[in-house]
Amino acid sequence: MCGIIGIIGNDEVAPRLVDALKRLEYRGYDSAGIATLQNGRLDRRRAEGKLVNLEKRLAGEPLPGVIGIGHTRWATHGRPVERNAHPHITTRLAVVHNGIIENFAELRAMLEAEGRKFETETDTEAVAHLVTRELEKGKSPVEAVRDCLPHLKGAFALAFLFEGDEELLIGARQGPPLAVGYGEGEMFLGSDAIALAPFTDTISYLEDGDWAVLTRNGVSIYDENNKPVERPVQKSQNTNMLVSKGNHRHFMQKEMFEQPEVISHTLANYLDFTTGKVRKEAIGIDFSKVDRLTITACGTAYYAATVAKYWFEQIARLPVDSDIASEFRYREMPLSKDSLAMFVSQSGETADTLASLRYCKAQGLKIASVVNVTGSTIARESDAVFPTLAGPEIGVASTKAFTCQLSAMASLAIAAARARGAIDEVREQELVHQLSEAPRFINQVLKLEDQIAAVCHDLSKVNHVLYLGRGTSFPLAMEGALKLKEISYIHAEGYAAGELKHGPIALIDETMPVIVIAPSDRLYEKTVSNMQEVAARGGRIILITDKKGAESASIDTMATIVLPEVPEFISPLVYALPIQMLAYHTAVLMGTDVDQPRNLAKSVTVE
């Protein structure tokens, strides 16, 4: 969500802070700001809206200094206006914060009773005043932060800059990620490796409860008990990553077109296409000893998990519960020690997913994760990690991360089926071959972009859209509806086609587009019956099917998008593309901010 950067450098820091903040734009934000020290004096610049507004402010009012902190804010407490933008400043310090201070009202009341004046509506300002209070008692900055951290309840990543001290940054983490970056004669703090990539490829991730004291020459890290600790130093996978749209209009479009390549990379990590077998060394779990699987995730990752539920149950004959993390963690589900708990997250930092993981871990379950960031907290706390090799995904609406999650879990379903004796070697080879063909089919779908874009002219003029699907096409319908909502702001709902008569059919009239995802599989005839019910009530059908399905539908449609005929097993991978492109081109026609849609964040690191 919010993005943090801190630099103790040797050069003018303001341009570097802004450059890092640009790399954090993908996380979502509504205001931004930076603070620096010049001759020991704190100064800051803030702006509502996009970073270009901050850059304009800095062009007119430069901010000198070689040490500073920066922030992109996604509003939680207080409106998205400049007054509430970070950094927050007192006479003694500046602070930036990602997260939520749950006891801020209590802290604020105490501090106001002491006569301290608050200028904002934010929870973060309470932290600034609390640490200032300790500094005014004569404590050093290190002592003041150390003594304040135990009084903060909630989730937070913090970075502090202190008046009069051009050799000191302090960071703290409880929940949202915070990384330390190592340079030559300079040090860095950042929300993730992407922010630090222009400056260093050598980083350490703080653990929950850690706080770090950075000087120009190094870092001292302390745990929640204030004991010195060392955290692993690693090379960032995102080193020298060029965050560029290339020849594409948006990152989302670029990332859609990267899918054949990144899916190939992900599949090759788990499957040997020469032998037609699963790479056992890449699995690391004995599925023959697993009697039940729970897959927990949020948002798009949850829909990937729900597709995977069908695969594991149908192919591996393994019972599966797919759960929304924010519900799972509170419903006190009975768990068996022979169950495997799997967690799916692009960032590996999703707050509710991480909390669910820790709940299962406390119950003694074996933990597996499917993540795109292998250095993330979820990955570090898992017994087995299954990476999705999607590369950095900048567009807030997930595309390639979703299909790479599907690719990884499809591979795991084959591995589980083989280990449990649900399929023989011949069937394993058939399924591996089918997956190996998926990138080729996806390339064919990408060539339909202009045709799909043409359909969106009508979609962009409506207020409501219904998506229908059966089997694995049902979670795709929900994902398609989510995509359209996220980036076009059109209200959309995804339903199981068989549920049409149980309520949604009341919405059907001549103004309602109904997008039907219907490959010509064993469920196709059932879905055709539902389409006939829609057509009989004047609904405007957009049918996504293959040639065989299009020829046998015998229904007038608003549009038919004809995809290649593919095996049922891989249809979710192939049919994901048109629903992404429908959402994308509808949003483009409506003029919305496709890569950074309103109110959304890429990485949801607070509950």
From Swiss-Prot:
Residues 283-422, 455-597 form the SIS domain. One of its GO terms (cellular component) is cytosol. GO terms for molecular function: carbohydrate derivative binding; glutamine-fructose-6-phosphate transaminase (isomerizing) activity. Its EC number is 2.6.1.16. It is found in: Cytoplasm. One of its GO terms (biological process) is fructose 6-phosphate metabolic process. Pfam families: GATase_6, SIS. It comes from the Bacteria. Residues 2-217 form the Glutamine amidotransferase type-2 domain. It is an enzyme of class 2 (transferase). The keyword Disulfide bond does not apply. Homodimer. This is Glutamine--fructose-6-phosphate aminotransferase [isomerizing]. It comes from Brucella suis biovar 1 (strain 1330).
